[in-house]
Structures are given as structure tokens and as C-alpha cells.
Design a protein with these regions (language model features):
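Acidic, Mg2+-coordinating phosphoryl-transfer loop and its flanking beta/alpha structural elements
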Residues: 269-313
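Non-catalytic, alpha-helical, charged scaffold/linker segments
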Residues: 58-160
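Short, acidic loop-to-helix structural element flanking the phosphoryl-transfer center
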Residues: 11-14, 19, 24, 140, ...
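Conserved Rossmann-like nucleotide-cofactor binding loop
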Residues: 30, 37, 210, 275, ...
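Receiver (REC) domain switch/active-site residues of two-component response regulators
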Residues: 28, 227, 312-313
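Active-site neighborhood of HAD-like aspartate-dependent phosphohydrolases
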Residues: 2-71, 89-92
Length: 313
């Protein structure tokens, strides 16, 4: 974990020595391990998107033992470009990249052989990149629709039963259990309880839709520890009014959670991506906030830590 605050010990040490009044958390891979849910959903959404339909982009690989098109390391590396905190946006950006690759055969196996995410990311110096940046660089593809991405992604993540319940329609692309069932709690609830006992308020600023955020927090019995929550739902509502993107690294979700907690407090924001750190940096214009990088679940923690350090100031 990267933090500018020095570690201390003892009861109420955080409150007394660090003098933070409130902690704001991201959810994914900070409070809840989502490597096998959200990140895997990105991979499977891309595979379905490219290989499903009467005239698919690519023919699917044969055999039950076929390798996935992308790895978790690929997804993590791509997200370091910035502007891809939202998983639908990340999926969109990856599809733009994949469909720009030169292939001789229209098969997923051939496409896999051309993928070099790390090399592509290394070349990009102007960050955050985001969906607009990658389409400016590689060109927009008329076959990539965010609505279709969202539909496939939600079917895979929620699973047949919950998707039908929440969307009031039956799944088309995925009729199995949802990958959200694979999620695990990162910390024991007692840690949050100790923070509350120390007089620290707790908030959340997440890119999850509100239903998915509340569902997960309630499932792991930690919802009641949080005094304020800002989700993608509130971000989209504000975007509709302001006619601009307010997703991380924009500080909107942090500022909104801080407003609910009391904006004059001193905040610590804990996230796992450069977008999180950059959002906190941007929020410093309006509130007293520091950030802590939390690359615990990165496939390459040292590399992730170095990228987070570049963003911190």
C-alpha cells in the first residue's frame, strides 16, 4: 500500500496521528476482490462480442481447453492507461485496440497471437487516454456499440437469475451463474468497526452501478459501516445535466461523497488505479484530501506500485 502518511500503532492511532476525519474507499479490489468477477467479465464480454452473431468478427476457438483471448494481466495493464476505470469503457477501449490489429485469419486464435497489450501501453505517454483518446489514435469502429457491450457484460456479471430479475428480460448471451458470485471480501469487517470506533467516518466513491454496490456491501454485511456512498448512478445523472464526462479520474464522485460527509473534513481516499489517485489530486482544489494506492491484487504489484507513484503528488 502506498501512502504519504507514516504508519503508527495503538488504539485510535489513525485518528490521533494522521488526523484524518474520514476515509473514502473505492470498492473494487480495495474492499472487495473483483479479479474473478469484473475483470473476468471484461474478458468474457470481449470474447462473446467478437464471436457471437450471424456474421461474427472472428470465429471462436475450438475445444474446451482453449486459452482465454486476454489475461487478467492484460486488463490490469490496459487500465493503467487511465480513463478506463469504468469496465464498460475498458471493454470498449480494448475492442478498439483488438480490431485495429492486422490478422490474416478471422479466428480468435489468430487474434490472440497478435495481442501485445504491455507494448502498446508502454508507447502511450499522454494519459489518461480514455475512450476518446484511443478512438482518436486508432480510429472509431462502427461495429462497436456501448449498448451491446453493456448488455453482454451485465448478463455475464449478474448471471441468468439476477439479470432477469433486475432487467426484466431474459439473457441472450449468457445463461449461467453470474461471475459476481466469485467475489470475496478483502478485509474483515472488524477493521471497519475499529475505524468507526476511532471516530473516523467512512464513505465510498465507486464506479459500480448503485444496485451492484449496495448488493455487494449488503451481501458481505458491511453496508452499515458507511456514512456516504456515491456510485455510477449519481455520476451518470450529473453527466446528463453537465453534458460532460464526470467519471474517474474526474473528482466528481469523491467530491460528492465528501459533500455528504462534510466537505471541511480531512479525507484519505483509498483506490487501486492511477485514475483513483488522479481523481484525488484533482479534488485537492476543493477539499483537504490525500490518497493511498492499494495495488494488493495486481498481477504485478511492483509495476502497479510504480504507476501509482507516478500519479501521486
Amino acid at each position: 500500500m502506498i501512502t504519504k502518511a507514516k504508519p503508527v500503532q495503538g488504539k485510535n492511532a489513525i485518528a490521533k496521528t494522521h488526523k484524518f476525519d474520514a476515509f473514502i474507499f473505492d470498492i473494487d479490489n480495495v474492499l472487495i476482490d473483483t479479479r474473478k468477477s469484473y475483470l473476468e467479465s471484461i474478458i468474457k464480454t470481449i470474447e462473446v462480442y467478437l464471436s457471437y452473431g450471424q456474421i461474427p468478427f472472428f470465429s471462436a476457438s475450438k475445444g474446451a481447453s482453449r486459452k482465454p483471448l486476454l489475461t487478467l494481466e492484460d486488463i490490469e495493464e490496459f487500465k493503467l492507461l487511465g480513463g478506463f476505470n469504468d469496465d464498460w469503457d475498458c471493454t470498449y477501449g480494448l475492442l478498439v485496440y483488438l480490431l485495429s490489429l492486422p490478422v490474416k485469419k478471422r479466428t480468435l486464435d489468430e487474434l490472440r497471437s497478435k495481442i501485445a497489450i504491455a507494448a502498446f501501453v508502454k508507447k502511450i505517454k499522454n494519459r489518461p487516454l480514455g475512450t476518446s483518446g484511443i478512438t482518436d489514435m486508432l480510429g472509431a469502429h462502427t461495429g462497436i456499440k456501448i449498448e451491446r457491450i453493456g448488455r453482454i457484460f451485465q448478463e455475464i456479471y449478474l448471471g441468468k437469475s439476477l439479470f432477469t430479475q433486475t432487467e426484466k428480460t431474459r439473457p441472450v448471451f449468457w445463461k449461467k451463474r453470474g461471475l459476481m458470485d466469485r467475489e470475496k471480501l478483502v478485509f474483515r469487517p472488524q477493521l471497519l468497526e475499529k475505524l468507526k470506533e476511532a471516530g473516523i467516518q467512512l464513505g465510498i466513491a465507486t464506479g459500480r452501478p448503485r444496485f451492484e454496490a449496495i448488493f455487494a456491501l449488503r451481501k458481505f454485511e458491511i453496508l452499515d459501516y458507511f456514512d456516504a456512498i456515491t456510485t455510477m448512478g449519481e455520476v451518470k445523472e450529473a453527466e446528463a445535466i453537465q453534458k460532460t464526462s464526470l467519471r474517474k479520474p474526474h473528482p466528481f464522485s469523491l467530491l460528492e461523497t465528501a459533500r455528504q460527509l462534510g466537505a471541511k473534513k480531512k479525507f484519505l481516499y483509498i483506490g487501486d488505479l492511477p485514475d483513483d489517485v488522479n481523481a484525488a489530486n484533482a479534488a485537492k482544489k476543493d477539499i483537504n484530501i490525500q490518497s493511498a494506492g492499494f495495488p494488493l491484487f495486481a498481477a504485478n504489484p511492483f509495476h502497479a506500485q510504480q504507476e501509482l507513484k507516478k500519479s501521486q503528488r
